[in-house]
Amino acid sequence: MKRSKINAIIKDFEKMLNEYKFALPPFLSWTPEEWKTKGHEYDEIRDNALGWDVTDYGEGNFETKGLSLITIRNGNVHNKKYTKTYAEKIMMLYPGQVSPNHFHWNKMEDIINRGGGDIIFRLWNANRENEGELLDTDVEICSDGRRYFVKAGEEITLKPGESLSLYPYYYHEFYIPKDSKPVLIGEVSMCNDDNTDNRFYEPLGRYPTVEEDEPAYRLLCTEYPRAV
């Protein structure tokens, strides 16, 4: 992805967060130059990949297959120094965009429609013996205190304010209808590592390759300099 594209997406994201009065921690407004002055007291941000994250899953087609997100808080499954057992993210999805089909081996999460248009989900049970197989079995849904079953791959609509619980080995994809508005999406989950706990149905990259065509407006969570 071109840096100019990433910069524009982050600015869009900031505008949407302001529109819905979702305030962010101070570190999310630091410039690249400010990051160069930060010492080890901010290692939790670096070590746990808190911050901005814009991805096209390595396919170069962000408008249809992409996601913008911010990890606001997280623990670290690989480092006992960080004892948080929970994580929080806020995401933005544009109309026509899909977050591609995947499951988590360990993470349980709630996805919340925080405002904008509708989110459309499709879920399948994964075959634990053959993880690349989508089972044709009914999927148990837990949504805002209600439990019920749907057919595999059946569409589930989340309107603003509604949420959906996703359990390990639940294949899930979600998208925003083309005639909708951008959607602000919350995630409350167990502590997790996106590098090791995403099983995509079709092999995909997690982070983009960045083409530097202009200076960075905000650093991505994979780009922080070493502590001074």
Segments from the language model and where they lie:
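Glycine- and acidic-residue-biased ligand/ion/polar-headgroup-sensing regions
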Residues: 94-95, 107-109, 113-129, 133-137
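A short beta-strand motif that forms part of the nucleic acid-binding face
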Residues: 105, 115, 125-127, 170, ...
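Double-stranded beta-helix
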Residues: 2-3, 128-148, 175-228
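Short, conserved secondary-structure segments in the cores of folded domains
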Residues: 89, 109-110, 154, 162
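Conserved metal-binding segment of the jelly-roll/cupin
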Residues: 94, 152-179, 185-190
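A short beta-loop-beta micro-motif enriched in histidine and acidic residues
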Residues: 78-87, 98-110, 114-115
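A short, N-terminal "cap"/entry segment at the start of jelly-roll beta-barrel domains
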Residues: 1-87, 216-219, 223
